[in-house]
Amino acid sequence: MAFLALGINHKTASVDVRERVAFTPEQLVEALQQLCHLTESREAAILSTCNRSELYIEHEHLGADSILAWLANYHHLSLEELRASAYVHEDDAAVRHMMRVASGLDSLVLGEPQILGQMKSAYAVAREAGTVGPLLGRLFQATFSAAKQVRTDTAIGENPVSVAFAAVSLAKQIFSDLQRSQALLIGAGETITLVARHLHDLGVKRIVVANRTLERASMLAAEFGAHAVLLSDIPAELVNSDIVISSTASQLPILGKGAVESALKLRKHKPIFMVDIAVPRDIEPEVGELDDVYLYSVDDLHEVVAENLKSRQGAALAAEQLVSVGAEDFMSRLRELAAVDVLRAYRQQSERLRDEELSKAQRMLANGSNAEDVLIQLARGLTNKLLHAPSVQLKKLSAEGRVDALAMAQELFALGEGSTDKTPQ
C-alpha cells in the first residue's frame, strides 16, 4: 500500500506546457483505464484544470518514473521535458498534498473554492472509470473532510479572490467606467459563471454569453440578465464587445487573429480587453500582437492575484495546520487498517483452537469425567495451543539474534519489565 501524487501546476510549468498536459473531460475515463492497465497502478484518479494536471495513484511497488513515462507518452511529450516541470509526492506527503490542493492552499488564488468542486469531479470520473477502490476512496473522503474543515474553521475563503475576480479587476483597470462597457463571455462553466456574477454586480452595460450549446448559455444568461449566443456568433458579437473573457474546455483555439482584426476595423480601433483563462488556450496568442488589444493569459493574472491575497495569509497558516493534522490522522487510521486482516486471521485461528478444546472438554464431561478436572485441562490445553506457534517463532528469532523482534514481541504482548513470573519452580 503506497500513494503517489504526481503532476505539474502553475508554479512549475508555463501555460504552453500545461495546455499540452491537460486532459479533456472526454479523455479522462479512457486515460484512467489505460493508466491502470499499462502501469499496474491499483487505483488512480486524474485532476485536470487550467492551472494543474495531477495523477493520484495507489500502488504496491510502483516508481514515479513509469507514471511519468506514461504521461509523457499519452500527451506526446519528451520525458525530459515533462520531468523538468513535474513534481512527485509519496505516501504521507502525497496525502498532505491532496488535502492542500483541495483546500485551495496550492492554488494560484490562495483559498479559491472552485478547486474543491474540481477535486470532487475528479473523484466522480474515477469512480465512473472503475479506477477508485477502497484506499483511494478513503483518501478522497478524508481530503474532502479536511477541505471542509479549512473552510469552516478559518477565514481563508471570506474575501472574493479568484481567477475570475482577478480577470474582472484587470478589466476595471483598463476601463474606468464598466457601466458603459459591453462584455462577451465565452463558455458557460463555473469560472465564467463567477465572471458573469462579478461583472453583473459592477453594473456592466451588456453581457453576452457564447457557448457550444445554446441551452447552457441561455441558463447562465437568464441568471444575470444577459444574452445567449452560439460560438459561431462570436465574430458578429466581437464588434460590440469591449471585454472578452474566455474559459472553455476546447482543444483548439476558438478565437483567431483574423476575426479580431476584422472586428477592430469595424470598431474603428476602439480597444478590446481580453482574458484567456482556458488551458489549452481559447484565444490564439497572435491576437496579442494586434494594436488596440490587451490580451492576458492565466499566467498574467499572478500580479493581480498577489495584491488581493494579503488578507488570506494569516488564515492560510491556520489552514496549513489543519491540513497537517488531517493528513497525520488519515495515515494513522490507514496504518491501523493494515492490521485488520492479521487480527481477523489471528482471531479465526484462536476460535478454531478454542472450539477444538471445547469439543474435547464436552466429550470428557459426557463420558463422566470430573468437571473440575475437565476445566483445568481445558484451560491448560487452550493456553498451550495459543502459545505454541508464538513460542516456536520467538525461539527461532532468538536463535537468529533478532533482538528487535523479541523487543517487538514484548511490546505486542504488553510484557513490561518485571512482568515475568520469577516464582521458584
UniProtKB/Swiss-Prot annotation:
The keyword DNA repair does not apply. The keyword Oxidoreductase applies. It is an enzyme of class 1 (oxidoreductase). GO terms for molecular function: glutamyl-tRNA reductase activity; NADP binding. Keywords: NADP, Oxidoreductase, Porphyrin biosynthesis. SUPFAM superfamilies: Glutamyl tRNA-reductase catalytic, N-terminal domain, Glutamyl tRNA-reductase dimerization domain, NAD(P)-binding Rossmann-fold domains. This is Glutamyl-tRNA reductase. It comes from Pseudomonas savastanoi pv. phaseolicola (strain 1448A / Race 6). The lineage of its organism: Bacteria, Pseudomonadati, Pseudomonadota, Gammaproteobacteria, Pseudomonadales.
